[in-house]
A protein has these predicted regions:
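A short acidic, often aromatic-flanked loop/helix-cap motif at beta-alpha or helix-coil junctions
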Residues: 78-83, 103-104, 151-154
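Short, glycine/charged-enriched secondary-structure capping and boundary segments
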Residues: 48-50, 109-113, 139-142, 160
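Conserved acidic residues
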Residues: 31, 93, 122-123, 142
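Structured adenosyl-cofactor binding patch, chiefly the S-adenosyl-L-methionine
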Residues: 131-178
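General structural signal for secondary-structure boundaries
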Residues: 2, 77-80, 107-111, 134, ...
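RNA substrate-binding interface of SAM-dependent RNA methyltransferases
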Residues: 1-99, 164-171, 175
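Long, charge-patterned amphipathic alpha-helical coiled-coil/hairpin "stalk" segments used as oligomerization
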Residues: 96-137, 147
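Secondary-structure boundary/capping motif
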Residues: 42-45, 104-105, 133, 154-155
């Protein structure tokens, strides 16, 4: 992940990101929410938070939240997520990521939605934090979704907002067909 100076860093996982993205994933019936982070200290934080809701008192205290957090699985890297999907489905996933820029392999939400509903392979959609993923990482994806545009020229959504908007476009109700 880049910071605002285009230096490679590792951003911190937040409790809000874990909870809010898990709830959004559950709402849109995402099978797994892979929380990918290379640092051991972040793995420990992720496992402590998810463990509380998956196995601890949180499971009893708030079963709805627990149901959402059950979809979260920590993994150290993208290759592990691809391998896990292949293990679960027997198929190599189509890899799609997001960015605020256009790339040669940028696709529309309509095309990505068709892959989800009509394709014969599972789809792994990755979201980054900070100021985007490294160039080498971006080049490894099959596709990059077109940016989310609002009515202004400001285009730097927090990851929780981007996930909610994009999952609604990919897996939400097709309201425009009504």
């Amino acid at each position: 992940i880049y910071n605002k100076h285009m230096k490679v860093i590792a951003t911190a996982v937040t409790n809000f990101d874990i909870h809010d993205i898990a709830r959004t994933a559950r709402t849109y019936d995402v099978k797994k929410y892979f929380l990918i982070h290379p640092l051991k200290v972040q793995e420990e934080i992720i496992k402590k938070i998810t463990g509380y809701w998956q196995h601890g008192f949180g499971r009893v205290y708030n079963p709805d939240r627990s149901e959402a957090l059950d979809r979260v699985q920590y993994l150290p890297d993208i290759a592990s997520a691809v391998a896990e999907i292949k293990k679960l489905t027997g198929k190599e996933p189509v890899t799609i990521t997001t960015d605020a820029r256009i790339y040669p392999n940028t696709i529309t939400y309509k095309a990505a939605r068709q892959m989800l509903y009509e394709g014969d392979r599972p789809v792994l959609v990755l979201f980054g934090t900070g100021f985007g993923m490294e160039k080498e990482t971006m080049a490894a994806f099959d596709y990059i979704l077109e940016p989310v545009y609002g009515p202004s020229n400001y285009n730097h959504l927090c990851v929780r907002s981007a996930v909610a908007i994009i999952l609604d476009r990919l897996a939400g109700e097709a309201w425009w067909e009504k």
